[in-house]
């Protein structure tokens, strides 16, 4: 009976492979092919079926090898994950050597999640092996985000490379006044103190427009155009779009605020992910504070005092207490876990900080003859300090982009 069942299972797998291969070749649709394989990989992992997982992965690899370079790069992470999960399957079956073999192939394919690697219970049987340590150590420098950030603590306040002073559009600029009047932002902010007003506006933007990280933003990158494009739940905005809307709302109410792009070190050039949030200057606190419209989030110390980005970064590095507001959420579908949000995701993305020189209405809508300027705060640890100024033009729009590098956090976070 067991033998018959195994034979039947192999026949089913054979016909499944034939069907998937035909789809991939005839329709040239590797995405569908890969997605279906991934589902079967997971099923075989649950069954601890190393033999058929290995056969299926060999088939996946053959198809992957036929792709052009750009498509192979697109699916490199899936390849790494497939080998990693086969390593887990072997480890759960007590087979150390093939588990280590496929872990090595996963790392060669680009697997870099060091924190998961050292904590994954599936790999417990091989974690004490010398070969495991040899495989894991090199990816610590690219996948252990706390380790990376702690090596990037140092700046240089004496950095004399010149860059323009930050500028903030006045609230009475006609377009900002129109934004304020259209959405009655004075009423949204309320009659409380400046901190409560800033947090009320953060909450309003979060409630007004959902986050959608899977699509680009509308062509017009200003608050009124983007809110209108999303009206009635037609669409959402990615983190940059939400931060742009919040920034212009703050400017329209007379707050100095900035868009802040938080970037990883990405020494391998394989991580396109970043996160965009805001800082708003609260006069009564005499400081910038962290506000994230994607998660309706601000960050505090153990006393409940609101913190700015520089303070949060320093506290992560020094392992000092941090809190996020209890009402933080993503589209009201889940509450972000503090450890995941701050100590993994933001630890990764607080390596480089980038702000526009001009905090202005419609800042990032590209147009012929338009120049967009940015300042990047780099830690001394970063491997690309030069050139001090980089300029390029976008041939499609005719817009020009200028990036200034600095190691000076004092001037970067200068009060408005």
Stretch-by-stretch model annotation:
Residues 150-237:
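Secondary-structure boundary elements
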Residues 244-319:
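Hydrophobic/aromatic-rich core segments of domains that either
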Residues 75-82, 113-135:
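TPR/TPR-like alpha-solenoid helical repeat scaffolds
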Residues 26-28, 63-76:
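Flexible helix-coil transition and linker loops at the boundaries of alpha-helical arrays
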Residues 318-416:
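Low-complexity, Gly/Ser/Thr/Pro-rich intrinsically disordered linker/tail segments
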């Amino acid at each position: 009976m067991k033998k018959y069942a195994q034979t039947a299972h192999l026949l089913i797998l054979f016909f499944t492979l034939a069907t998937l291969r035909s789809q991939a070749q005839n329709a040239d649709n590797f995405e569908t092919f890969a997605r279906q394989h991934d589902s079967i990989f997971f099923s075989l992992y649950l069954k601890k079926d190393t033999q058929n997982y290995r056969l299926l992965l060999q088939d996946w690899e053959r198809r992957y090898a036929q792709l052009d370079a750009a498509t192979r790069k697109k699916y490199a992470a899936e390849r790494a994950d497939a080998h990693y999960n086969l390593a887990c399957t072997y480890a759960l079956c007590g087979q150390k050597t093939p588990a280590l073999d496929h872990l090595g192939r996963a790392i060669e394919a680009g697997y870099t999640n060091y924190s998961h690697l050292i904590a994954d219970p599936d790999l417990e049987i091989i974690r004490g092996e010398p070969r495991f340590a040899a495989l894991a150590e090199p990816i610590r420098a690219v996948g252990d985000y706390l380790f990376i950030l702690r090596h990037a603590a140092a700046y240089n306040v004496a950095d004399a490379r010149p860059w323009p002073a930050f500028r903030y559009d006045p609230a009475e600029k006609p377009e900002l006044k129109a934004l304020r009047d259209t959405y009655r932002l004075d009423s949204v902010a309320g009659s409380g103190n400046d901190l409560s007003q800033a947090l009320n506006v953060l909450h309003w933007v979060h409630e007004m427009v959902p986050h959608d990280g899977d699509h680009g933003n509308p062509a017009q990158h200003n608050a009124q155009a983007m809110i209108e494009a999303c009206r009635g739940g037609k669409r959402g905005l990615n983190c940059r779009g939400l931060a742009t809307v919040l920034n212009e709302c703050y400017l329209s109410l007379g707050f100095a605020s900035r868009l802040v792009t938080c970037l990883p070190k990405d020494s391998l050039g394989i991580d396109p992910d970043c996160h965009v949030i805001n800082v708003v200057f609260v006069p009564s606190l005499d400081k910038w504070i962290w506000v994230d419209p994607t998660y309706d989030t601000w960050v505090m110390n153990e006393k409940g005092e609101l913190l700015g980005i520089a303070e949060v970064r320093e506290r992560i590095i020094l392992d000092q207490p941090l809190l996020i507001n209890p009402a933080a959420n993503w589209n009201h579908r889940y509450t972000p876990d503090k450890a995941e949000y701050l100590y993994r995701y933001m630890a990764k993305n607080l390596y480089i900080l980038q702000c526009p020189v001009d905090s202005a209405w419609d800042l990032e809508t590209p147009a012929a003859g338009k120049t967009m300027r940015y300042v990047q705060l780099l830690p001394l640890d970063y491997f690309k300090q030069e050139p001090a100024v980089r300029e390029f033009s976008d041939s499609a729009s005719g817009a020009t982009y200028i990036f200034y590098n600095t190691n000076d956090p004092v001037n970067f976070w200068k009060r408005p």
